[in-house]
Amino acid sequence: MSHFAFEQIGVIRSPYKEKFAVPRQPGLVKHGGGELHLLTPYNQPDAVRGLEAFSHLWVLFVFHQTMEGGWRPTVRPPRLGGNTRMGVFATRSTFRPNPIGMSLVELKGIRCHKDQVILQLGSLDLVDGTPVVDIKPYLPFAEALPDAQASYAQHAPAATVAVTFTAELASSLALLEKRYPHFAAFVQEVLSQDPRPAYRKEEEPGKTYAVWLHDVNVRWRVVDGGFEVFALEPR
């Protein structure tokens, strides 16, 4: 059996500071963009020459927060309610023999300054600090296949949960919107995807949850089948 060693070429900077509530695919949270910072010695403008002519990129990365758990031959995809087992190679689970993921993201711009090369990205599904091992331009003629079949994931999941904020958060939201434009919409988009594990989605009303988005601890509770955000606690 052959073994290969790869070097990290970059790192992701995103508003998702923990695994919980990271979208399961890119494009689901419109306001959840981020950046890819190239590392030395790959942070050279020549390395991205011509990349600005492409609208989207494949980002290949490492599942660095789950790799210690090893791989599993079968997993339970969230899209199937967390109860049905599928072979790991029939899913995009993080528990793979090689902890490599791939994400298709929009390239919104490239910023080069001194020793920095930063790719500005659209909607992400990656946690802050994710190691990147390669990037490749997306080629629509070869990779957009309208007749492709995708079993249980043929269509994007619909936002399933209504998200509201308590009236007491109005002033806090106004301040956060100045620091993070569209912050309220971002929080609603993230939570509307219902990040709870499938086995917890039948929990009693009033159950509370929290997640770090940007540098804000967002706390919410289950109310009448929806989510009510009741606290926004900056770090």
Say what each PLM segment does.
Residues 114-124, 228-231:
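Short, solvent-exposed secondary-structure boundary/capping segments
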Residues 2-8, 95-105, 214:
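Short coil-to-beta-strand transition motifs
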